[in-house]
């Protein structure tokens, strides 16, 4: 009598692969915050300090407030708040961008809307907190309101003003001009004395001229963008 033998075959299970993260996730974040625009803001502010103010410190009565560390904080705060503004702008612009520039849409594709909101809040909090510290550092705690107002206005612009004829263009152009004026506010105003006030105001007026020029250039740019984006804006119900 033959014994029945059971032959067992063991089949190795294929290893489960860990889902790969999107290789361009970091690049997507950089595109979301529009790093080239942020770099331009930082460059302009650095030029104001080191090419406009610093050369005249020894030859005029010009006095500035911030050392390299303090000025670095001002630049960092500016680009953080601007980055937050760019993020919230992209979040609200998804529908129109899918029509006007579908290849450049980041939110909802390479970055989720939830992640975008987290980044928006993070950049805003960091930028405003640095502004709070910096305002107290120069002994002008009231300057903190500037950062809060800019942050709030960027949100209102993205969620409401951008959909309104010309009003949105004016608002964002004012914010662009403020990225220039804020250097004068923190560098010149806190150290005004009766001896140097003429010089301080002369340089502040010079900055004001630059800011007005930036306002006008950005207004033209925004109007041209509205003309280019008319199809997407119309389909989204925007009165631009």
Which stretches of residues belong to each language-model region?
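Multi-pass alpha-helical membrane architecture of UbiA-family
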Residues: 1-240
């Amino acid at each position: 009598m033959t014994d029945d033998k059971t032959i067992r075959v063991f089949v190795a299970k294929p290893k489960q692969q860990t889902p790969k993260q999107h290789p361009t996730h970091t690049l997507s974040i950089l595109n979301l915050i529009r790093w080239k625009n942020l770099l331009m803001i930082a460059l302009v502010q650095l030029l104001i300090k080191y090419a406009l103010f610093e050369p005249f410190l020894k030859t005029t009565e010009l006095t500035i407030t911030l050392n390299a560390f303090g000025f670095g904080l001002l630049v960092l705060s500016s680009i953080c708040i601007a980055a937050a503004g760019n993020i919230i702008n992209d979040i609200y612009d998804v529908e129109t961008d899918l029509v006007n520039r579908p290849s450049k849409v980041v939110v909802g594709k390479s970055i989720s809307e939830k992640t975008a909101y987290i980044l928006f809040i993070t950049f805003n909090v960091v930028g405003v907190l640095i502004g709070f510290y910096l305002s107290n550092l120069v002994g002008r705690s009231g300057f903190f309101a500037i950062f809060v107002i800019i942050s709030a206005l960027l949100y209102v612009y993205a969620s409401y003003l951008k959909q309104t004829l010309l009003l949105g263009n004016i608002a964002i152009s004012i914010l662009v001009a403020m990225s220039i004026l804020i250097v004068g506010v923190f560098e010149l105003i806190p150290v005004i004395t009766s001896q140097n006030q003429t010089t301080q105001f002369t340089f502040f007026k010079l900055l004001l001229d630059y800011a007005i020029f930036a306002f006008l250039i950005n207004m033209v740019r925004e109007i041209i963008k509205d003309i280019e984006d008319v199809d997407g804006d119309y389909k989204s119900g925007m009165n631009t």
